[in-house]
A protein has these predicted regions:
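N-terminal secretory signal peptides that target proteins for export/translocation
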Residues: 1-2
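Bacterial N-terminal signal peptides
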Residues: 6-15
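Sec/Tat signal peptide C-region and signal peptidase I cleavage site
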Residues: 16-20
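Residue-level detector of conserved, function-critical positions
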Residues: 21-213
Length: 213
């Protein structure tokens, strides 16, 4: 029994020392937002709580909101670090050379799979995303495969990833790495919890109210 207690004590001391080492030599520490702060070390990001405890370990898929092509928010509040809003933070996954965006919760669990070719941070439990759609338009019998086309819509999702409003689209999409080095721009922005402004093709703006869901 004494041996077990000693082993547990050693494990606790070791984990404490390890945690202290992990929080040294940091490259960047963000301000606190939603009671957590982002810390950067060696090109990877993690989150600490207000006690300085690492609550999400270092990972390489977190998205800085001023990243090129990402329409997170208004330029004056874009941040050069990841952050949480509405218990969601943006992540990125590269599939066949194309970046797809999704969200994790405050425990680091992926709650909305990376499936959007652009996405904003959440605002009052909602986010604006570019959602991809695939349509079979025929079949190439010679090659023995379906002929497909892709398009995307600009939509609003809730914190469960469900579409709650349609904004724009569909727009034709060439789904390959060369064409999507930079994601298509999101042309809408939040003015308030239920108010959205959207830029039209003639560079004017329209405002619409989004029903609560």
């Amino acid at each position: 029994m004494k041996n077990i207690i000693s082993l547990l004590a050693c494990a606790l001391i070791f984990s404490t020392v390890t945690m202290a080492q992990e929080l040294k030599n940091l490259d960047f520490i963000s301000p606190f937002h939603a009671e957590v702060a982002a810390v950067k070390k060696g090109g990877m990001w993690a989150f600490i709580n207000m006690d300085g405890t690492l609550v999400i370990d270092y990972r390489d898929d977190l998205v800085m909101t001023n990243e090129s092509g990402i329409a997170c928010c208004e330029p004056d509040i874009a941040r050069d670090y990841p952050f949480f809003e509405s218990n969601r933070a943006l992540i990125k996954e590269i599939k066949q050379g194309i970046a797809y965006y999704g969200y994790i919760n405050s425990t680091g669990e992926t709650v909305i799979e990376p499936e959007f070719i652009n996405a904003t941070n959440f605002h009052s439990n909602r986010a604006i995303v570019l959602k991809v759609f695939k349509e079979t338009i025929g079949r190439n019998e010679l090659l023995g495969k379906n002929v497909v086309s892709y398009s995307y819509n600009e939509e609003i999702i809730n914190s469960d990833g469900e579409t709650v409003a349609f904004l724009r689209g569909p727009f034709n999409l060439i789904l390959d790495e060369k064409n999507l080095k930079t994601p298509p721009k999101i042309q809408s922005r939040f003015l308030g919890p239920n108010l959205i402004s959207t830029k039209s093709e003639n560079n004017t703006w329209e405002i619409q109210t989004i029903n609560q869901k």
